[in-house]
């Protein structure tokens, strides 16, 4: 008989939300590390958790960083950050332009503007 069987295998990515949740959880538990030069010349440099007394190495599953990020809320000429003081924000937004996020907990002033323009309406 001339029958044939076909098998198809595929790999699916997990739900995008679950990937984001795992990354956020890892981000909230990051470890600061520092490079340590091995004492023996044949051994490579490795990373240890900073401020750990017993040269504890991070696990492969940990998210690590070498230097703390600058505070982008404040003006810092050395890092090229203009800060967020004086920037326009959206009080009702829940996105990156929200006042709660952009003002870094300092509070904000509200201003109301009226704009008048010709609309070239035809009746």
From Swiss-Prot:
One GO cellular component term: extracellular region
Keywords of the record: Developmental protein, Disulfide bond, Extracellular matrix, Glycoprotein, Lipoprotein, Secreted, Wnt signaling pathway
GO molecular function list: signaling receptor binding
Positions glycosylated per UniProt: 79, 90
Record InterPro entries: Wnt (IPR005817), Wnt_C (IPR043158)
Covalent S-S links between cysteines: 89-104
Lipoprotein in keyword set: yes
Free-text description of this protein's post-translational modifications in UniProt: Palmitoleoylation is required for efficient binding to frizzled receptors. Depalmitoleoylation leads to Wnt signaling pathway inhibition.
Record-linked PANTHER family: PROTEIN WNT-2 (PTHR12027:SF112), WNT RELATED (PTHR12027)
Function: Ligand for members of the frizzled family of seven transmembrane receptors. Probable developmental protein. May be a signaling molecule which affects the development of discrete regions of tissues. Is likely to signal over only few cell diameters.
Name of the protein: Protein Wnt-7
Lineage: Eukaryota, Metazoa, Echinodermata, Eleutherozoa, Echinozoa
Encoding gene per record: WNT-7
């Amino acid at each position: 008989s001339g029958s044939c069987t076909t098998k198809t295998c595929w790999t699916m990515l997990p739900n995008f939300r679950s990937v984001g949740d795992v990354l956020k959880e890892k981000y909230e538990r990051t470890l600061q590390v520092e490079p340590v030069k091995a004492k023996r010349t044949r051994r490579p440099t490795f990373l240890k958790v900073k401020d750990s007394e017993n040269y504890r190495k991070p696990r492969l599953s940990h998210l690590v960083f070498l230097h703390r990020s600058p505070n982008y809320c404040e003006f810092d000429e050395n890092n090229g950050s203009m800060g967020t003081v004086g920037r326009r924000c959206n009080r009702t937004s829940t996105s990156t332009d929200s006042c709660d996020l952009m003002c870094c907990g300092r509070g904000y002033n509200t201003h109301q503007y009226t704009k008048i323009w010709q609309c070239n309406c035809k009746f």
